[in-house]
Amino acid sequence: ASNGVILITTKANNRSTSKGLEVRYNLSYAQEKISSVPNYQDTYMQGSNQVYNGGYIGNWGQPFPSQVDAINAQYGTNYTQSVVSSSLSAFYPDGTAPHPLVGISRNYSQQQYFPDLLIREGYSFGSDGIFVNGTGDHIVDPTNAAVFLGVPVVLKAHDNVGGFFQTGSLMENSLNVSSSSDKASVNFTLSNSSNDGIIPNQGINRTALGLGINSTLDNGLYIQGSVNYVNTAQKSPPSGASYNNDYGGGSGGSVYGRLFYLPRNFDLNGYPYTNPVTGGNTFYRALDNPRWLVENNQFTSDVNRVFGNLTLSYDLTDWLTVMARGGFNQYTDQQSDFREKGGNTFNTGSYGEWTVGNREIDMNFLLQIDKELSPDLRLSGTIGHNVNERST
């Protein structure tokens, strides 16, 4: 599923339609879901070389505890359900591991913010946020399991991808009012579409106004024209194409890049993702949590577009017609990019905004000839001049 812009041009009403006033209203609603996700395996967990590693990206570790017996029977291997050393087995029963947000070396700095996720026996936090023992001495040795290890978490596969996306919705409303007579017609259109995307905090809203006329005056002058205004406002977290290695880099990466490469045993929808004190990012690696990304980093675009055309035509004789035809198209796009402080790359935050635009005017002056000179000879042709102006 994707979000986009549907551009509807309001045309002058066709005078061949029924005469009088006509009013039409249309309402439609649709839901959308992600079309497909990768086909994930639930046999092997986080790590490398068939060894569990709570700080690793890929799923190259040993089998999930629930799969150990089947794998051993099939391949003659000797995997166990334990993923920790014998010295830590008292803290972690088979099939469990230290909580990944606090129980691996890269996340010691997060321990002071999540005391409930830590095994602490006889230790506490000092005033500076560092663990101290009963005499107030700092404990900095990560081999002291009773201090620095996270609480046990059960190692099992989680549906992080399917649980992340939401059901999108598309609501469209349109009102059309038209009136026509033998020599003239008028057509007015007002429409709005609102689309909430499949990614949280992603959406687009479009409002359009259009007016068209079509008339032949008593003096023979033919007039046809339309003018349209469209406003398109959209917002989205970083959700471009996914990187295929190590998630890309920091806050600059895509939500998809963070999400699709998560270890199967990492409970994205169950673990904390926001620092309860600073509001910053919380993750098991030096990258931004996809849940934190969609809530805090956002790109916006607000496009205002005006376009239209006008044609004037007059028959000087039954074989000679003069015509003036012009059109214009102008838009401005106000964009912004917000990165909340506390992210991995943009730790102090960032904000930028800029405006892009374009204007084009096109005019044609034409003299059209269509004359029968004799039964065997006919002269047809167009003489004209074009003026085109573009600016950005």
Residues of each region from the PLM?
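A beta-strand signature from Gram-negative outer-membrane beta-barrel systems
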Residues: A1-R24, G163-F165, L170-E172, S185, ...
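Short alpha-helical segments and helix-capping/turn motifs at coil-helix boundaries
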Residues: V5-T10, L170-N173, T207-G210, V306-T311, ...
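Outer-membrane beta-barrel channels and translocator barrels
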Residues: N13, L170, S181-D182, T216-D218, ...
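Surface-exposed loop/interface segments of Gram-negative outer-membrane beta-barrel transport/assembly proteins
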Residues: R15-V154, G197-Q202, A208-R305, M323-T392
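Outer-membrane beta-barrel architecture
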Residues: R24, S174-S178, T189, G212, ...
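Short Pro/Gly-enriched beta-strand edge/turn motifs at strand-loop
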Residues: V154-N160
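Short coil-to-beta-strand
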Residues: D182-V186, T332-Q335
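An active-site-proximal structural segment forming one wall of the substrate-binding cleft
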Residues: L320
